[in-house]
Design a protein with these regions (language model features):
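Extracellular, repeat-based ectodomains that mediate carbohydrate processing or recognition
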Residues: 2-518
């Protein structure tokens, strides 16, 4: 055993460092988005990459539609997101198809005509189709209609302005609203209508001016009692690079004569420093009397190996004093699109894949938190990939430590030049002088290796006060014990033991600190 001590001792330290590195990788890739909020839980897959309707039943179950080639799958989940039932419908489906499903009644739109479940045409040449909770809106020939799912009759609601080809519906608790938006140059005009028995009643109208270089990309609105809020997402084209997006919000009330002002929003990154970038798929709603936005954005995450940036799901709450409070609702290295709120405690989104997209949810429901905490095969693979990437950093960090290693090597070479073969004799002062020179180099050039960025990235067990000096001295003691064992068991002379001491010490240190050097 003593003969093997010279490699067993440093090997134990290095293997322990690699194990801690892997454990840190597991911790990073499985980190919850925020306290008391679950990780993503996969509940299905779909072949399309856009909106999928969700219904919450009075009993607290969820009906989620997933799309496959020529097949609609309606899956029913309980409040713990355990699937309790499923039904499939054979209809032609692609990413343009929109479906109304209420109980067993199915009506769909193929971007041209509206059909019943048997494939019979109900309405031809319909430009737009809006499936809602218990009714359907559609646009045909510049007119907005309501389609009654029970008897398949159509009622004209309002004639839209020429050139207007889309509306934004909003299902309130008691009423159904829709918004029209018209943009001319940098003028944006918004009208809010309430659906009545006699058609549509305009309840609010306003206009905004945006920057002349910007164009409206998306709009949304929300109504709660008499409170009204608008969201505008604009894009400014750049002469070089990607277009820059901007988000604005305005708050007012129905019946108010005061013109609301657009407030530009910047979303702070709740998990990192600075702001979230490229917010998209933004929706606005009132949650517990407070205005809140749900969106996907690029923000900080430790689930990735190098960039520490990925698209995840976020909410932004706008307080009464105008403060913006962001919260992260997903934490994954994969791209997230089309986030959707199921209720106050659960959100859903698509995770893009090469052939199929995964449907995931996250929630504050304790049952979901527990269910989503299980490590998946993907978690293990991502943790292994991140660990191997960190090991690659260790190899590069070793190059930086040459500033330490070169000094004992130069000392040994110079002593051979001066003393020659006499150094092969057991000269204690030579060995200890070489060790002292190396240790002096580690302290003199301490800040070259132990940089501030390293401590910002490293875990807590490496960043306590004086940690770099404590680890340096502790590993020096281990290296010294292992080095001294070679004197009696392998008859190593002082030069070999000096070089071995420095090499073993460096390998042990970089196994712990190297992954966080850059």
């Amino acid at each position: 055993m003593r003969k093997q001590l010279f490699w067993i001792l440093p090997s134990i330290i290095i293997i322990t460092g690699i194990f801690l590195m892997f454990n840190q990788s597991i911790t990073d890739v499985t980190e919850q988005p925020e306290a008391n909020w679950s990780r993503g839980l996969e509940i299905g897959t779909t072949t399309v990459d856009k909106t999928f309707p969700v219904q919450e039943t009075p009993g607290g179950n969820f009906i989620i539609q997933t799309y496959e080639q020529d097949k609609l799958r309606a899956q029913i989940f309980n409040h713990e997101f355990k699937q309790i039932n499923e039904k499939t419908y054979d209809i032609p489906l692609d990413k343009w198809t929109r479906v109304f499903l209420n109980h067993d009644q199915l009506i769909y739109h193929d971007y041209n005509d509206i059909y019943d479940q048997d494939g019979d045409v109900i309405v031809s040449n319909a430009k737009r189709f809006y499936p809602l909770g218990s009714t359907i809106l559609y646009i045909k020939e510049n007119n907005l209609y309501e389609l009654n799912p029970d008897d398949l009759s159509s009622t004209k609601i309002v004639e839209l302005n020429k050139g207007m080809e889309d509306i934004i519906p909003f299902q309130g608790k008691k009423q159904l609203y829709f918004m029209t938006e018209q943009s001319l140059n940098n003028d944006v005009k918004l009208n809010i209508y309430e659906l009545t028995d006699n058609g549509a009643k305009r309840v609010y109208s306003t206009s905004f001016q945006i920057d002349a270089m910007q164009t409206v990309e998306d709009t949304d609105f929300a109504v709660r009692d008499s409170n009204l809020a608008f969201m505008l997402e604009t894009v400014q084209k750049q002469s070089q690079g990607s277009p820059e997006s901007y988000t604005y919000v305005a708050k007012t009330s129905i019946g108010s004569n005061r013109e609301p002002s657009l407030k530009p929003l910047t979303f702070p990154d709740p998990a990192g420093e600075g702001s979230l970038s490229e917010p998209n798929d933004i929706t606005i709603s009132y949650q517990n009397e407070t205005l809140q936005l749900l969106f996907s954005a690029n923000g900080f995450t430790e689930t990735t190996y190098q960039e520490n940036q990925a698209f995840n799901v976020y909410t932004a709450t706008i307080t009464d004093n105008g403060e913006i409070q962001s919260a992260r609702k997903s934490n994954t290295a994969k791209g997230t699109v089309d986030p959707k709120r199921l209720n106050n405690s659960t959100v859903m989104w698509l995770e893009q894949g090469s052939e199929r997209n995964n449907i995931l949810i996250s929630s504050s429901n304790p049952a979901v938190i527990d269910k989503a905490s299980t490590l998946s095969q993907d978690d293990w693979l991502r943790a292994l990939g991140k660990t191997f990437g960190m090991l690659a950093k260790v190899l590069i960090t070793i190059l930086a430590t040459t500033i330490w290693f070169i000094w004992p090597v130069v000392f040994v070479v110079l002593m051979y030049v001066v003393k020659g073969r006499k150094l092969d004799e057991d000269i204690s002062w030579f060995f200890y002088t070489g060790i002292v020179i190396y240790m002096l180099a580690t302290f003199i050039f301490h800040d070259i290796i132990f940089i501030d960025g390293m401590f910002a990235r490293a875990p807590d067990y490496l960043t306590f006060t004086g940690s770099s000096y404590i680890y340096t001295l502790f590993f020096a003691l281990i290296a010294f014990i292992a080095t001294q064992s070679t004197k009696a068991t392998h008859d190593w002379h002082a030069p070999a033991r000096i070089i071995y001491f420095a090499g073993a010490h460096i390998l042990m240190l970089v196994a712990y600190f190297g992954p966080y050097y850059f």
